[in-house]
From Swiss-Prot:
Molecular function (Gene Ontology), one example: transcription coregulator activity
InterPro entries xrefs: Mediator_Med30_met
This protein's name: Mediator of RNA polymerase II transcription subunit 30
One Gene Ontology cellular component annotation held by this UniProt entry: mediator complex
BP GO annotations: positive regulation of DNA-templated transcription
Main function: Component of the Mediator complex, a coactivator involved in the regulated transcription of nearly all RNA polymerase II-dependent genes. Mediator functions as a bridge to convey information from gene-specific regulatory proteins to the basal RNA polymerase II transcription machinery. Mediator is recruited to promoters by direct interactions with regulatory proteins and serves as a scaffold for the assembly of a functional preinitiation complex with RNA polymerase II and the general transcription factors.
Species, as recorded: Danio rerio (Zebrafish)
């Protein structure tokens, strides 16, 4: 026994409306991405048409060609307007679906697998830290060495002055 064609049509229509309700956010995002790509493509075509159009600046032009290009341009603009409305609907629907969700940081969504490169980076960081510590110590030792050299120079100057005074006294005595 077959169902009447009208009943089949209404059953198919109910299935389609149910499927339309069950569209998930990921497929909406894909539809939005395709819509954006269509918008970019149409915009590029509009610029191509505008670039190829000749302005009526005294040069003979064919009115039919001009009207044809103008018609194409207007059709592209209408299509672009429809695509932007479609994109707005997809955007609103995505926001509606995601309204109750809390944003999850992207770091938590990406699984972390420790690999050799992270170990290598840790080793390099440790070596860098050790090298900078060693350099700091060398700079400290150089600073202390300069201070000690200054002190030795002062002592040598004092000894030289003392020896000169002793020699002067001995010379006066003799």
């Amino acid at each position: 026994m077959t169902t009447p064609p009208l009943a089949q049509f209404s059953g198919q229509q109910q299935q389609q409306t149910q499927a339309a309700r069950d569209v998930n956010t990921a497929s909406l995002c894909r539809i939005g991405q395709e819509t954006v790509q269509d918008i970019v493509l149409r915009t590029m075509e509009i610029f191509q048409l505008l670039r190829n159009m000749q302005l009526p600046n005294g040069v003979t032009y064919h009115p039919n060609t001009h009207q044809d290009r103008l018609g194409k341009l207007q059709e592209h603009l209408r299509t672009l307007s429809v695509l932007f409305r479609k994109l707005r609907l997809v955007y609103d629907k995505c926001n509606e679906n995601c309204a109750g969700l809390e944003p999850i940081p992207s770091e938590q969504l990406i699984p972390y697998v420790e690999d050799d490169s992270s170990k290598l980076e840790d080793r390099m960081a440790n070596q860098l830290r050790a090298a900078s510590e060693e350099r700091r110590e060398v700079l400290e030792v150089n600073k202390k060495l300069k201070q000690k050299n200054q002190q030795l120079k002062m002592i040598m100057d004092q000894l030289r002055n003392l020896i000169w005074e002793i020699n002067s006294m001995l010379a006066v005595r003799s």
